[in-house]
């Protein structure tokens, strides 16, 4: 956790007002919360509350070092879209836990272990706004702003998503 806080402090000292923690797509923070990858039997495994302990430690350390005015945007996979991976229900449960330690939740999907089903942005074969359904479902359960990412290619589509309250920002 200290190394993440150190990097956040460097960003703050350079004038940045926030950091984006990449807790999705199978990277380390995601590996702790994913049932596909976290098979630990200690205090960091088992329930979602236990699996969320390390991401929480990272967020708390960043706030401790950088202050509450330094924002944390937490990027998470709302679903890993692969067998044995996080489901939307898991994503909602994690978002409900992590929301008290972050300022913004950024919803993507997939994992680098499964490139076919990773939806950081849409291809020409996917619907545009391919993660909006995940972001909208998570938004219903949290009190912090939610970002949806995934191929928003038209201003009208963005306006519609925002007006419908499905997300607070798009990326």
Predicted feature residues:
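Flavin-dependent oxidoreductase catalytic cores
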Residues: 1-171
